[in-house]
Amino acid sequence: MAKKSMIAKNEQRKEIVARYAERRAELKKIIKNPNSTDEERLDAQWELNRQPRDASPVRVRNRDAADGRPRGYLRKFGLSRVRVRNMAHRGELPGVRKSSW
């Protein structure tokens, strides 16, 4: 099980990302637009750099929904590989079977 403080910090990052997402998208659009002037582009870059680091979606870590394990995360299930394996063996995941060939 992950430390509760790390899980809480990750949740806080998700909120910050959501809060700044729209403005970040606008600034990135200005920066990437070939029709914007150099000054507009520079101002947009400057404002983007002034935003908090945690506003970047890259800083959010995918974690197991059950216990917060940060590694071995499977997006399809929202769980770690260890938990998926245990749940599959117990038959708690519909449509998931142990492979055999």
Curated annotation (Swiss-Prot):
The keyword Ubl conjugation does not apply. SUPFAM superfamilies: Glucocorticoid receptor-like (DNA-binding domain). The gene is rpsN. Part of the 30S ribosomal subunit. Contacts proteins S3 and S10. Belongs to the universal ribosomal protein uS14 family. GO terms for cellular component: small ribosomal subunit. HAMAP family: Ribosomal_uS14_1. Binds 16S rRNA, required for the assembly of 30S particles and may also be responsible for determining the conformation of the 16S rRNA at the A site. The lineage of its organism: Bacteria, Bacillati, Actinomycetota, Actinomycetes, Mycobacteriales. Keywords: Ribonucleoprotein, Ribosomal protein, RNA-binding, rRNA-binding. GO terms for molecular function: rRNA binding; structural constituent of ribosome. This is Small ribosomal subunit protein uS14. The keyword tRNA processing does not apply. Disulfide bonds: none annotated. One of its GO terms (biological process) is translation. PANTHER family: 30S RIBOSOMAL PROTEIN S14, SMALL RIBOSOMAL SUBUNIT PROTEIN US14A.
